[in-house]
Amino acid sequence: MPEKKPSKPQVAENPIADVFENRHPSAAEKKWAEKTLAPTLEKAPERPIGAPTGVNLDERDNARFTTISGVPIRRLYTQADLPEDWTEEKYLGYPGAPPFTRGIHATGYRGKLYTMRQFSGFASPEETNQRYKYLLEHGGGGISVAFDLPTLMGYDSDHAASEGEVGKCGVAIDSLEDMEILFGGIDLEKTTVSMTINSPASVLWAMYLVVAEKQGADWNKISGTIQNDILKEYIAQKEYIYPPAPSMRLVIDTFEFGSKFTPRFNTISISGYHIREAGSTALQELAFTLYDGIEYVEWARRRGLDVDDFGPRLSFFFNAHNDFFEEIAKYRAARKIWGQVMQERFGAKNQRTWLMRFHTQTAGVSLPAQQPMNNIARVALQALAAVLGGTQSLHCDSYDEALALPTEEAARIALRTQQIIAYESGVTQTVDPLGGSYFLEASTLQMEKGAFDYFSKLDAMGGMVKGIERGYPQKEIAEASYQFQRAAESKEKVIVGVNEFVIEEESPHILYIDESVARQQTAKLKTLRARRSNDEVRRTLDALKKAAAQEPKAGTNGNISPANTMPYIVDAVRAYATVGEICEALREVYGTYTEVSIT
């Protein structure tokens, strides 16, 4: 049977019908559509969507131009695609002022460039310390700590569950001693540090605070961020330890403690990054992330905390994926929505509470192992979208993201990508340079509406914790992930080097972490436990368990709650209790969480 050739594109009966669909074009646009567009489409129909070769158009008659998330894109955007009451003052505004669509700072990057914060951590604290110093010497503006899986799960390196994972996907941190090594020779009053840690966040943060204290740093002056976003663990990343309610209690403990003792430190980075990496659409990333933020504020207010006390230290973390304009629209909508929610839903009076400050990381999930050097171009475009969207800090993934932890060369190229955008592209010289684009403004409003639709659904469920227990966000993400995979396998979405333009290639040089790191960490733990006062460790852990078992209530007379766990964790850290020992003490009180089956 002869091979069926792809058919020619078919011209619709009315090729300009979409010009009038759900919109009111101007007389000039109607004239253009009839006199210029229609004849053009008759002579040269628009190209097929998806793969350039081997796809039968008869089988793809439902294909449309869409974003990577599947949102339809019009041929041309004009004033007709904006609300009839659209004005610059009402919908767009000015940078540094409500509704914050154009940014939270009046001067944008003319005042201060985004912080170039490369996510890094591998093997031992000693090796990672050297990598941090290398990055700082080559222009990095801050440190972002990647921990290994045992640390993320609250296990010491010598625990049976840690076998084969020590130092593999981040740095192994077991005790205060390791944290002292990690930041040795780095001035913590002058360096902002972000730590990607969630279930054991309060433990690792306590270790950081004690290291700063030992350096002679003033807690009032140190700045940085702990991720501390447990909700997205239940939704997407799955690195949880305790059930949702006690986990939320630990998060609110850090809010209260931070407001009192570390006013410049962000006690949470509410994270959409992992939600997107799990397969969500851009809209789902936006909506679920912001609603996670709403949930944290609700829980903090129920504790009796004032939103204007902790609100200014809430920060966010977003993904930068491949669809350039969709990503920029997402960031702009996020700022606008958050400012509105904080004012109208929570009655925040402090303008700093209205501001959404966010970090961005390029999309690791978009960087395939095939033809990895292509990822340099992908990362550059993603990073550019983040900058045009007004990010406060940025991490560029390395081109070898899918293969291993980055080599020194790969990490340097990633940092240089940020620097080229900042210093050579010209995009940082004016504020919100794409503002006013009909396409971008329409996309921003579409994101905003979609997010509030999700908010209504989650409100009806009783909040995000209730939604998680029902499996709602998990199901939404699973369906979106399936649809994207289907589109990739059918070549409806082209992935260069993966489903099109494929070549045979050799494997590149990658970084390898051997098992000596685990042996080294185990030996250090043995020595530590022999040297420290184990009676003091037991005393501090018993005190922590007693506090954790109490119901926390709002503090009085400017003090924090007597049951706040943070002071007890700090005491245990000072006694050189390990990450695993502190987390085990909390496991004894709270138990562990098993996810319900999602069907």
Predicted regions and their residues:
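Active-site cavity-forming subdomains of large catalytic enzyme subunits
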Residues: 140, 162-302, 327-341, 372-380
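Short glycine/threonine-rich loop-to-helix capping motif typified by GTGT followed
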Residues: 204-206, 279-287, 321-333, 362-376, ...
